[in-house]
Amino acid sequence: MANPIEEQLATNLYFDKTFNCEAAKILPGEYYTTNQDIVIVTVLGSCVSACIRDKVSGIGGMNHFMLPEGNPADANNPVSESARYGTYAMEVLINQLLKNGARRENLEAKIFGGGNVLSGFTAINIGEKNAAFVRKYLRDENIRVVGEDLNDIYPRKVYFFPRTGRVLVKKLKQMHNNTLISREESYAKRLKANKVAGEVELF
C-alpha cells in the first residue's frame, strides 16, 4: 500500500554569510514558517513557491511544491487528485501561519517558479500548470498577490525575508550539476506513486 504524501517542515537551518543572518533552506515538498528575522531559501525549477506573510506582524513562510501529473482532462477540476494536492500544499502553509499568529485578512503573497525545466510530462507543461494553479488558488482565497516571477525556461534561486516581505530572485542561466533536476524528478515520482495525505479543508 502506498504511503501518503505529506508536506514536511524544513529542517535544514544554517547561518547565511551573505546576508549575515539565520536561514532555512526548503526542498521540494517542504515548507517553513517563522516570526523571526531570518531568510528562507529555495531553488525552483518546474516547482512553485508561495511566499506568504502577514503584512502587519511580519509572520511569514514559504512552501515548495508541484502538482502531481494527472489526467489532462482534469486540469481545471478542483477535486482532481492533482488539484487536491496543490490545495493541501497551500493550506498546510497558510494554516501554520495562522497558528503562529498571522491574521488571514493581512496575508499577502509573492509567487515564483513554474519554469519549463522538467521534460517527459504529458499535455500542458508542468511548470505552467503549477504557476496557473497557485495564481488561481490565491485569487479564489482572496489573498493578494503583490509580486510574481513565473514560467520562463530558467531555474530560480529565491531568498524570502518574511519580516520585511523582501524577495531576491536569481535566475540560474547556467547549471553546474543536475541536482535540481534530480530532486524534482524524484519528487514528481513520489507524488505519482503515492496518495495525498489527509483530508483537505476548503475554507
From Swiss-Prot:
Instruction: Give the E.C. number(s).
Output: 3.5.1.44
InterPro entries referenced in this protein's UniProt entry, alphabetically: CheD-like_sf, Chemorcpt_Glu_NH3ase_CheD, Cytotoxic_necrot_fac-like_cat
Query: Which keywords describe this protein according to UniProt?
Result: Chemotaxis, Hydrolase
In the record, what terms sit under GO molecular function?
protein-glutamine glutaminase activity
- Catalytic reaction equation(s): L-glutaminyl-[protein] + H2O = L-glutamyl-[protein] + NH4(+)
Record SUPFAM superfamilies: CNF1/YfiH-like putative cysteine hydrolases (SSF64438)
Q: State whether keyword Cell division applies.
A: no
The cross-references to Pfam families, in alphabetical order and at most eight, read: CheD
GO annotation, biological process: chemotaxis
Q: Family per UniProt?
A: Belongs to the CheD family.
> What the protein does?
Probably deamidates glutamine residues to glutamate on methyl-accepting chemotaxis receptors (MCPs), playing an important role in chemotaxis.
Q: What is this protein called?
A: Probable chemoreceptor glutamine deamidase CheD
| Originating organism | Methylobacillus flagellatus (strain ATCC 51484 / DSM 6875 / VKM B-1610 / KT)
